[in-house]
């Protein structure tokens, strides 16, 4: 009675095809930050900001298992409540643009508004951060 070798032969026949598979799209990427700057007292994305968000979305699509984290910043000089509100609006604008560019909203985590002494300058306080990959 002949032995059944079909499963083993099937696996051997598939090896040349599997050897050419590119698994990099499934691996976790190095953390990649993107910094988006806004006009004072604004959460509107200008052309340069949209380009940065589009670049972040493209990178996120290459690594579909990587988390995407968004943080909005606000200028503490305008008061804590107003700065927190602006930071949330900026984060929301980034999330909206990322999803419009094809990033699944379920992958995007929004960090609490960043307001306070850790924001060293008014320019730094007028930004939003997008990090694709694990946070450092």
Model-identified regions with their sequence ranges:
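Bacterial Sec signal peptide processing site at the extreme N-terminus
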Residues: 18-37
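A short small-residue
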Residues: 33-38, 72-76
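Sec-dependent bacterial lipoprotein signal peptides
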Residues: 1-21
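Periplasmic peptidoglycan-binding/anchoring modules of Gram-negative envelope and division proteins
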Residues: 42-71
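Periplasmic OmpA-like peptidoglycan-binding domain that tethers envelope proteins to the cell wall
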Residues: 74-136
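Short, charged, intrinsically disordered terminal tails
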Residues: 7-9, 23, 130-136
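Short beta-strand/turn micro-motifs at beta-sheet edges
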Residues: 23-27, 56-57, 119
